[in-house]
């Protein structure tokens, strides 16, 4: 089984590329969504967050996002602390998920923070979804109802696209001009070669 990751900045089209891969019968684990799920459902994460932030970190069984956000943004060390609680469990959950996909030749993981979380070590190849920054801003503003300033701040907080591109094995250009399916078909064919087995 070949494990791939799909990553890219906000508004690059990661989820759309993941959707196209799923249409090609390649199941994709969405690490960002699963991290949110595990933050509520995993007893270990819940216990550590309660020990760190108190019972009020969960309200009516749901994560108190404003409280967590205020903690995260008050000190950069807090981000590392929270990530050290959540990311190992996401990694373990991905491993269990992969085992359940035993009949698949290729499986994927979608993660906006693949490199920051160290998830690149769990896959055989990385696909970086690249789009021009102005297009990404427009997409994110439309999708999230965010202001341009908010989107630019989120872009600035993420790893630079060129660094992600340099580290990735493949790049899909999602600029609204280049066709996506032929790019993905070429990548999937390359993945099936000996290099990735």
Q: Where are these predicted regions, by residue range?
A:
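ATP-dependent NMP and nucleoside kinases share a basic, alpha-helical "lid"
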Residues: 92-101, 106-142
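Hydrophobic anchor at the beta1->P-loop junction of P-loop NTPases
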Residues: 6
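ATP-binding Walker
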Residues: 12
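Walker A/P-loop
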Residues: 15
């Amino acid at each position: 089984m070949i494990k791939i990751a799909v990553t890219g900045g906000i508004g690059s089209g990661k989820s759309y590329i993941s959707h196209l891969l799923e249409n090609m019968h390649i199941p994709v684990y969405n690490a960002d969504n699963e991290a949110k799920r595990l933050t509520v459902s995993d007893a270990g994460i819940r216990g550590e967050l309660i020990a760190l932030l108190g019972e009020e970190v969960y309200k009516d069984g749901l994560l108190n996002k404003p409280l967590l956000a205020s903690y995260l943004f008050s000190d950069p060390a807090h981000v590392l602390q929270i990530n050290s609680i959540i990311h190992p469990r996401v990694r373990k959950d991905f491993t269990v998920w992969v085992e359940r996909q035993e009949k698949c030749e290729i499986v994927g993981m979608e993660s906006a923070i693949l490199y920051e979380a160290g998830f690149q070590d769990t896959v055989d190849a990385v696909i970086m979804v690249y789009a021009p920054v102005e297009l990404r801003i427009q997409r994110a503003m439309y999708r999230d109802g965010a202001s341009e300033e908010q989107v630019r701040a989120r872009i600035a907080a993420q790893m630079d696209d060129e660094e992600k591109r340099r580290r990735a094995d493949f790049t899909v250009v999602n600029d609204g001009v280049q066709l996506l399916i032929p790019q993905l078909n070429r990548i999937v064919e390359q993945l099936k070669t000996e290099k990735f087995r």
